[in-house]
């Protein structure tokens, strides 16, 4: 009987999901994206060669693995085409391996224009969006005016819907934001060309998934961003526009929740965040600079440097609860090599030193939180390439055990380097 596993980030994204997904695709028949868009960045390093994907599931490099983009993803046709062509140049048969739901809302030029105009208007209160139209595309979905992949394949339906939605967007762009309108002819012509490119990849993804399930195949659901960026459960409003938590997998694919067997939470051995928003354990000293330098903390999508801080057990406990995390994959443990002291946030206090209890539901709560730390001894030995848990330095083992106690779930996988063979698999989610 097959296993159906959700893999997602438990922090603010950039946890190293791409490498872990690629490692575990050895055992799967399909990898499925269920939310987000091309604002995600998945970096894969195989035999020293780096491939960065933003939209296509990380399993695309694996022969025999079907990659599926589910209905919960907002799809930029231009971004998808660029990725597919790059993969084809590398000899990867991306068109054959990729299937796309006809129900995916499209990201079109007016979404990008409104996204960038709004962020500019916010000034110092900007949210930190990538400016790629993700949020506005999700707005259209909820407002029931989205143009979806299936609409694009019908030229008359596409023209009718595009005319209607452009009237709305061009009014807002010109009258409120005082920027140039978007040309109907340009969007329509480009859309028709893109329709023919997409057509071979569009499929009934719900039936495809359930056929795989009935056949006893292993299926992986690949999350984008991180749990603390979830539109409902993250540091609102400094969040993304989709449900990045495990509940997004059933909704974003049409795969019933009771068919899911395991949730793997990808977690850095420290904490990072890109862009604006609260970050209780953020460091502004040499320790923070060292983590960023050793961890090469620059966003795969934006190139922006990431803010760095110590491990936050409080935020992790929250992520474990809202995702029903079965086990953790701890990444970038090697970045802590050479640290004399490592701090772990075990609780929050307010400005007066009083304990903060319960779950925080917005950015105001997180901004008032002050981290309460426990100091643990570091290690001087290298963890890179360690082949099993016992081969890790004693203090590294103790650090991992402490984190397990704090968050209440086991560390099932440990990443000690960027290459997929630099990984300790204690318990494989697909073989339990």
Swiss-Prot record:
The residues that the entry says bind substrate are 300-306
Check the record and name the PANTHER family matching this protein. Answer: ADENYLOSUCCINATE SYNTHETASE
Which Gene3D superfamilies does the annotation name?
Adenylosuccinate Synthetase, subunit A, domain 1, Adenylosuccinate Synthetase, subunit A, domain 2, Adenylosuccinate Synthetase, subunit A, domain 3
Listed A to Z, the keywords are:
Cytoplasm, GTP-binding, Ligase, Magnesium, Metal-binding, Nucleotide-binding, Purine biosynthesis
Which residues take part in binding IMP?
A: 14-17, 39-42, 130, 144, 225, 240, 304
Q: Which organism is it from?
A: Marinomonas sp. (strain MWYL1)
Q: What is this protein called?
A: Adenylosuccinate synthetase
Give me the gene this protein comes from. Answer: purA
What InterPro entries would the database entry show?
Answer: Adenylosuccin_syn_GTP-bd, Adenylosuccin_syn_Lys_AS, Adenylosuccinate_synth_dom1, Adenylosuccinate_synth_dom2, Adenylosuccinate_synth_dom3, Adenylosuccinate_synthetase, P-loop_NTPase
């Amino acid at each position: 009987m097959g296993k159906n596993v959700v893999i997602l980030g438990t922090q603010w994204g950039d946890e190293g999901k791409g490498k872990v997904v690629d490692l575990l695709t050895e055992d799967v028949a399909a990898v499925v994206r269920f939310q987000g868009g091309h604002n995600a960045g998945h970096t894969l390093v195989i035999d020293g060669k780096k491939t960065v994907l933003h939209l296509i599931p990380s399993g695309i490099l694996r022969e025999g693995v079907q990659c599926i983009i589910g209905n919960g993803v907002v799809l930029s046709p231009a971004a998808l085409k660029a990725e597919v062509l790059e993969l084809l140049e590398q000899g990867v048969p991306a068109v054959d391996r990729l299937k796309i739901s006809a129900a995916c809302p499209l990201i079109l030029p007016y979404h990008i224009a409104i996204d960038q105009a709004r962020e500019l208007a916010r000034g110092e209160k900007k949210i930190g969006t990538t400016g790629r139209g993700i949020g506005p595309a999700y707005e259209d979905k909820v407002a029931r005016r989205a143009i979806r992949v299936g609409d694009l394949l019908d030229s008359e339906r596409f023209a009718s819907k595009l005319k209607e939605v452009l009237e709305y967007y061009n009014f807002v762009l010109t009258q409120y934001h005082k920027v140039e309108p978007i040309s109907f002819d340009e969007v329509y012509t480009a859309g028709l060309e893109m329709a023919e490119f997409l057509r071979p990849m569009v499929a009934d993804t719900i039936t495809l998934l359930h056929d795989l399930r009935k056949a006893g195949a292993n299926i992986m659901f690949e999350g984008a961003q991180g749990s603390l960026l979830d539109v409902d459960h993250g540091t609102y409003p400094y969040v993304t526009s989709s449900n990045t938590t495990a509940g997004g997998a059933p909704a974003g694919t049409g795969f019933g929740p009771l068919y899911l067997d395991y949730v793997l939470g990808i977690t850095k051995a420290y904490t990072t965040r890109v862009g604006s928003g609260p970050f209780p354990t953020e460091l502004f000293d040499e320790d923070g600079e060292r983590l960023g330098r050793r961890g090469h903390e620059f966003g795969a999508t934006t190139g922006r440097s990431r803010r760095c801080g110590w491990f936050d057990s409080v935020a992790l406990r929250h992520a474990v609860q809202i995702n029903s995390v079965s086990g953790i994959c701890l990444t970038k443990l090697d970045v802590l090599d050479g640290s004399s002291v490592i701090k772990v946030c075990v609780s929050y206090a307010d400005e007066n030193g009083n304990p903060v209890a319960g779950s925080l539901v917005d950015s105001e709560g997180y901004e008032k939180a002050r981290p309460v730390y426990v100091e643990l001894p570091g290690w001087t030995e290298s963890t890179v390439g360690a082949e099993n848990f016992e081969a890790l330095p004693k203090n590294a083992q103790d650090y991992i055990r402490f984190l397990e106690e704090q968050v209440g779930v086991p560390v099932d996988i440990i990443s000690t380097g960027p290459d997929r063979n630099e990984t300790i698999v204690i318990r494989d989610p697909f073989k339990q």
